[in-house]
Regions:
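A signal for specific C-terminal beta-sheet/loop modules enriched in small/flexible residues
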Residues: 34, 65-66, 101, 112, ...
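The conserved cystathionine-beta-synthase
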Residues: 16-34, 41, 83-100, 107, ...
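Tandem CBS (Bateman) regulatory domains
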Residues: 1-13, 52-97, 119-152
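Short charge-dense sequence patches
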Residues: 3-11, 21-26, 40-47, 115, ...
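A glycine-centered beta-loop-beta connector
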Residues: 30-33, 38-54, 96, 104-120
Length: 152
């Protein structure tokens, strides 16, 4: 089976927001584009964070923050895993599985966002990547490891 580069599998049309964008506007962009996350980039388009639907729910809505005045920099995930478009998809799959992350910003050598790789992208290309590899990756991403906290 041919080795596939991340650039062949990733989504290339990526929306992004700046750290000072308010949470409400970021959520609207995500909703309008049917996406579950959005990279947060500085003026040079370098990734400084990622905002997920989960971040909005747990760090803004559940904390009763005013979304129209709360900048995404206050609720975004700052420890962002990224991958390079020239690397093999298997490298990104390992990163996603080991860290249980569903979406990975794809950045060039200058850390500028050029795409995003999602579980959906992997599923769309499963025949080229290897169906069993994709299934294993998704299973590992979704497998809850460790103890869970009872919120009730």
């Amino acid at each position: 089976m041919k080795k596939m580069k991340i650039s062949e599998c990733m989504s290339k049309d990526v929306c992004f927001v700046k750290p000072d964008c308010n949470t409400y506007d970021a959520a609207r962009i995500m909703c309008e584009n049917h996406i579950g996350c959005i990279p947060v980039c500085d003026e040079q388009k370098s990734v400084v964070g990622i905002l997920t639907d989960r971040d909005i729910l747990l760090r803004a809505v559940a904390c009763n923050k005013e979304t129209k005045t709360t900048p995404v920099s206050e609720i975004m995930t700052t420890n962002v895993y990224t991958c390079n478009p020239e690397k093999e998809v298997t490298e990104a799959q390992n990163l996603m599985a080991q860290n249980q992350i569903r979406r990975v910003p794809v950045v060039d050598n200058a850390n500028k966002v050029v795409g995003i790789l999602t579980m959906g992208d992997l599923a769309k290309h499963d025949k080229k990547i290897g169906q069993q590899n994709v299934c294993t990756t998704i299973e590992n991403i979704c497998n809850c490891q460790g103890s869970t906290k009872n919120c009730g």
